[in-house]
C-alpha cells in the first residue's frame, strides 16, 4: 500500500480507568519500602515516612503546609498535633489507597481528624457510615456531635431524623440530655411528625421534670414553641392539676392564663400577628384530620325534594388517606358553618326542612362526643364562619325572610355569643376565610338575589370593612381558602353558567385576581380547606341537566399550587353538599 493510500490517523484521545489506580498502588509500595520519601511526620510517638507531593495533592491542609511558605515546608521532620497515631495511620492509608477502615469504635475520632486535615472524602464517608447507624436511641447523640464539629450535612440529616421519628425519640434517655437551646430548636420545627400538639407539650414537660431544680427557670422558654390554641383545654388543665410540685403548677397556671389573655385581647403588634399565623396552625408534618360535617345528600337524577339533611360526620386521616365515620351531630343540618378553636370542632347554625337554626354544637376529639353550647343571637344558614384571635366569627347568612347583615362573635371560654358589627354588603352562601388577623368575604348572593363578584376585608379590631378588587366571575355557593398569602375562590354557581369548575386566586402582591387550573369536576356548595400547603375540596353538587335536581358529590380533589394541578383522592363515604369542613 502506498503512502498516499494509508488512512489518515484519527486525532482521538483514549483513557485508561486503571491508570490512576496503578499509579496510586505503586506510590503506596514506594511508601512501604521507604523509596523516594522526602519528609517524616511525627504523630504522637509514631513516625511516618511519606512523600510531600502525594500528601499535598490529596489535601489542602498538606498543600498549605508544604508549599505555602511555612517553616515546615523545608523541614525533614514535621510534627502533626491534634491527631492520635492510629487514626492518622488510617487516614494515611486512605491517601495512598483510597480505602479507609471505618468502624463504630473509630468513626468519631476519624471524622474529626479528617476534617482537621481537610480530607473531605473521608469526612463524607464517615457521614455516610453514621447515617447508616442512626436509630431513635442514638440520634440525639449524633445530632449533638454533628453540631459540635459543625458538620452541616450530618446535622441536617440527624435533625430530619429526629423530626420524622419524634414520637420514638422523645421517650429516650438522650432526649432528656439535650441543652435548652437544642430542645427549643427541635420543638419549634414545622417538620415534627406528631399525632397532636399535646405530644409536644408532654415532651417539653418531660425535659423540665428530669431536672426540675435546674430547669424550672426555663419553663417559659421551653414551652414557648408549644401551640397552646391547638391543645384541648380540659386535657391541659387536668395535666396541670396533676403536677405535684406547687411552684411549677402555679407557673404553668400563670403561663396558660397570660397566654389566653394575650390571644383574647390582641393588640396591633408583631407578637399577635405571629400568634395568629403560627400558633393556631397545626404543624406541617403533624397528623391532621379533615372533618366533613353535616350538609345534605341527594341521588343523581332525584327530585329537588329528595334532598336529606345530614347529621353524619366523617374524618379523613392525612397519614392513612382513609375516610372513617365519627360521632354524628345531635341536629342534622345543611348550610352550616364549621370552625376549630382550642382543639374542638364547632358546628354553627344551618337549616333543615326550612327550619333555620341558631344552635351550636362542639365536638371533643378526645371524648369523641358532641355537646351543645351557647346559641347565636340570630338563627342563620348560608353564613360565613372563621376563627380570629381565638374567637369564632359568624357573618351574614340567611335568617328567614331576609339576609342577615350582623356579625356575631363567640368566646369559647365564656360560652357566649355577642353581636359585634355588621356586614358592609349583606350576603349569604358566600366564601369566608381569615388571614393574618383579617376576615375576608367573597362572592355569595345579594339582597336582590344576584350572585356577587365583590370581595371585602373586615378588621375585627377597628370593626371596619374595606372593598377589594372583585372576582372575574360571579360566584355563590363557592369554596374559599387562604394559601401561601393568596386567597382562592373555588367553583361555586351562578345562574348563567350553573355549577362552576373554574378557580380564581387573589394575589395581594399584584392586587388582582388571576385564573388558575380548573377542578376536574364542576362543584357548587363544596367545602374547601388548606392542609400542608395543599388545597382540599370535597363534595358539593354537580350541574343540573334537563331540569333534574343536581346530585351531590362524594369526590375529593387536591390542588398543588406549585404544579398548578388538581388530583383526585379517596371519596367520602357519603356524598354531601353545603356541609362544613374543619382541620384538626
UniProtKB/Swiss-Prot annotation:
BTB domain span: 37-104
Compartment list: Cytoplasm, Cytoskeleton
Keywords tagged on the record: Actin-binding, Cytoplasm, Cytoskeleton, Kelch repeat, Repeat
Function summary: May play a role in organizing the actin cytoskeleton.
GO MF term set: actin binding
Keyword Disulfide bond: no
Protein name stated in the entry: Actin-binding protein IPP
Highest taxon, organism lineage: Eukaryota
Pfam families xrefs: BACK, BTB, Kelch_1, Kelch_KLHDC2_KLHL20_DRC7
Tissue expr: Expression seems confined to tissues derived from trophectoderm and primitive endoderm.
Keyword Lipoprotein: no
Kelch repeat spans: 296-343, 344-390, 391-437, 439-485, 487-533, 535-583
Primary site of residence: cytoplasm
InterPro entries the UniProt entry points to: BACK (IPR011705), BTB-kelch_protein (IPR017096), BTB/POZ_dom (IPR000210), BTB_POZ_IPP (IPR030104), IPP_BACK (IPR047067), Kelch-typ_b-propeller (IPR015915), Kelch_1 (IPR006652), SKP1/BTB/POZ_sf (IPR011333)
Annotated GO CC locations: cytoplasm; cytoskeleton
